[in-house]
Amino acid sequence: MRHLLLALLLLGGARADDEEKKEDVGTVVGIDLGTTYSCVGVFKNGRVEIIANDQGNRITPSYVAFTPEGERLIGDAAKNQLTSNPENTVFDAKRLIGRTWNDPSVQQDIKYLPFKVVEKKAKPHIQVDVGGGQTKTFAPEEISAMVLTKMKETAEAYLGKKVTHAVVTVPAYFNDAQRQATKDAGTIAGLNVMRIINEPTAAAIAYGLDKREGEKNILVFDLGGGTFDVSLLTIDNGVFEVVATNGDTHLGGEDFDQRVMEHFIKLYKKKTGKDVRKDNRAVQKLRREVEKAKRALSSQHQARIEIESFFEGEDFSETLTRAKFEELNMDLFRSTMKPVQKVLEDSDLKKSDIDEIVLVGGSTRIPKIQQLVKEFFNGKEPSRGINPDEAVAYGAAVQAGVLSGDQDTGDLVLLDVCPLTLGIETVGGVMTKLIPRNTVVPTKKSQIFSTASDNQPTVTIKVYEGERPLTKDNHLLGTFDLTGIPPAPRGVPQIEVTFEIDVNGILRVTAEDKGTGNKNKITITNDQNRLTPEEIERMVNDAEKFAEEDKKLKERIDARNELESYAYSLKNQIGDKEKLGGKLSSEDKETIEKAVEEKIEWLESHQDADIEDFKSKKKELEEVVQPIVSKLYGSAGPPPTGEEEAAEKDEL
């Protein structure tokens, strides 16, 4: 997998950025789009602010749900109703984004996901019931776009203005297709994603802002909900350089939860003979409680898991100890040390050469993980300065500040490096390298090749990434043909192959026949995994339509609630001798009671009525009540619509 890492330079005059500053992009936000949780930050008044959502939480679950009433929920509200609506609550879209249907990790994941994942155009798509008996299929990009929209709205509510530009982070191990799909998700959400940067590097930026002196080797250990990355960075006089990176795109807190779940499912089967897996809702209830218990075990030694009417009416009650949790996951915990060992080897450093260890991601709160890291580094304490949940968004916000043209960032400029070698296949399946690993990008390299046989009319250019000498052991990125080569003996035609990588790590490969000027090229992101511009446009329109539908639905619900609260408020006041009940003649009281009961009955059988119906029913009720109350109060004022208003009127 080709991925980019960032080197951070402190330059006196940030010339590279002056170009970008010419375009006024407004406030650029930094978004950590996580597998399980997302976080948004902004560079404001010379410092980073991590922004809390409407629930007051600084991290937002990367969840989207569709209720039977046709309402779409995003974030906390979606996660909170997971147990009651598992088939239509979508999470872990990041596990699917930019991947093909046949990807073994996709096939592995869909076994555990409670919602339906289907194949469409050789890619995984998510199928849910969006209410009213309607089924809809979404690309993972669309689900991620909904989460990004939530983060965008969170920032807009805080800033009090529109946000259109963002820096979004991805795991260092994301390949081109996954990076491009993440950018597409931004486009669908109405965001111009100015940069895609790697999570561990973003964390290092957050960490590096306060520690600009001296020469240091920093190891970033990032274990989140779904991915694991280790990066080794060096800082020398304010220059960050990424020396090596490693990890596992498929290891995180959710995998630890899964182990505990499997343990309790087996235990329950052993005790009762019943298989809980048959009941999606029971499994999801267990998942929620297991996650809670896991968090509790970071600060205490045991946690109770209690679930009322867990399965077939029976309750569930078990204790999970920290020791048992560690035992169930010990192989996974220990496996995190292999990538650490690998980055040290790749960068020719000894354990004792590491100056700082930075722990990032919620799973690094697990005491056993902290202990293993500490033991690996012979007792060295990891740094505690950064909130592990927010470090990535913090770094993204710093980079967003640079792109906003915010002077207070001290003219930081980011340079990317490409830590996997890129090349093409030549005769015998040999990997011929054009761009070596750790080359600073943007970059451009060319080399002349020729034909392998006489009168060969076509050459096939196969583009690979990886460090192995034979292409079969490396990762194929894309293939294209250069045709129309005039007949000539082998070795005579001159074919120039050019590799070019831009700042976002998107690779373009061109082949040109120097004799004829014939050219062909490939942009590696445009493989079969990439959404077409038409699909993106359709998804953007869908997203807007959803926003419009959400607004209409909210207006309808508001109108229903207004009628309902008006009717019940009147009912309460008529029944209260201290209020209207004690002031009305029995005839007037009966008139209002009858009208109110009529509306309440109508409401019960017309929950799905139109906004106009709710409004007209409220008006009908007002027309009955108004003259009676006006007569009572001796004025033409409107009737009391609630107890507070009634109290205010009494004071008048």
From Swiss-Prot:
ATP binds at residues 34-37, 94, 225-227, 291-298, 362-365. Residues 418-498 are annotated as: Substrate-binding (SBD). Monomer and homooligomer; homooligomerization via the interdomain linker inactivates the chaperone activity and acts as a storage of HSPA5/BiP molecules. Interacts with DNAJC10. Interacts with DNAJB9/ERdj4; leading to recruit HSPA5/BiP to ERN1/IRE1. Interacts with ERN1/IRE1; interaction takes place following interaction with DNAJB9/ERdj4 and leads to inactivate ERN1/IRE1. Residues 1-16 form the signal peptide. GO terms for cellular component: cell surface; COP9 signalosome; cytoplasm; cytosol; endoplasmic reticulum chaperone complex; endoplasmic reticulum lumen; endoplasmic reticulum membrane; endoplasmic reticulum-Golgi intermediate compartment. The keyword Chaperone applies. It comes from Gallus gallus. It is found in: Endoplasmic reticulum lumen; Melanosome; Cytoplasm; Cell surface. Endoplasmic reticulum chaperone that plays a key role in protein folding and quality control in the endoplasmic reticulum lumen. Involved in the correct folding of proteins and degradation of misfolded proteins via its interaction with DNAJC10/ERdj5, probably to facilitate the release of DNAJC10/ERdj5 from its substrate. Acts as a key repressor of the EIF2AK3/PERK and ERN1/IRE1-mediated unfolded protein response (UPR). This is Endoplasmic reticulum chaperone BiP. Its EC number is 3.6.4.10. The keyword Hydrolase applies. One of its GO terms (molecular function) is ATP-dependent protein folding chaperone. Residues 123-278 are annotated as: Nucleotide-binding (NBD). GO terms for biological process: cellular response to glucose starvation; cellular response to interleukin-4; cerebellar Purkinje cell layer development; cerebellum structural organization; chaperone cofactor-dependent protein refolding; endoplasmic reticulum unfolded protein response; ER overload response; ERAD pathway. Belongs to the heat shock protein 70 family. The interdomain linker regulates the chaperone activity by mediating the formation of homooligomers. Homooligomers are formed by engagement of the interdomain linker of one HSPA5/BiP molecule as a typical substrate of an adjacent HSPA5/BiP molecule. HSPA5/BiP oligomerization inactivates participating HSPA5/BiP protomers. HSPA5/BiP oligomers probably act as reservoirs to store HSPA5/BiP molecules when they are not needed by the cell. When the levels of unfolded proteins rise, cells can rapidly break up these oligomers to make active monomers. Residues 630-652 are annotated as: Disordered. Residues 407-417 are annotated as: Interdomain linker. It catalyses: ATP + H2O = ADP + phosphate + H(+). Coiled coil: none annotated. Keywords: ATP-binding, Chaperone, Cytoplasm, Endoplasmic reticulum, Hydrolase, Nucleotide-binding, Signal. NCBIfam families: PRK00290.1. Gene3D superfamilies: 1.20.1270.10, 3.30.420.40, Actin, Chain A, domain 4, Substrate Binding Domain Of DNAk, Chain A, domain 1. Its main location: endoplasmic reticulum. It holds the Pfam family HSP70. A motif (Prevents secretion from ER) lies at residues 649-652.
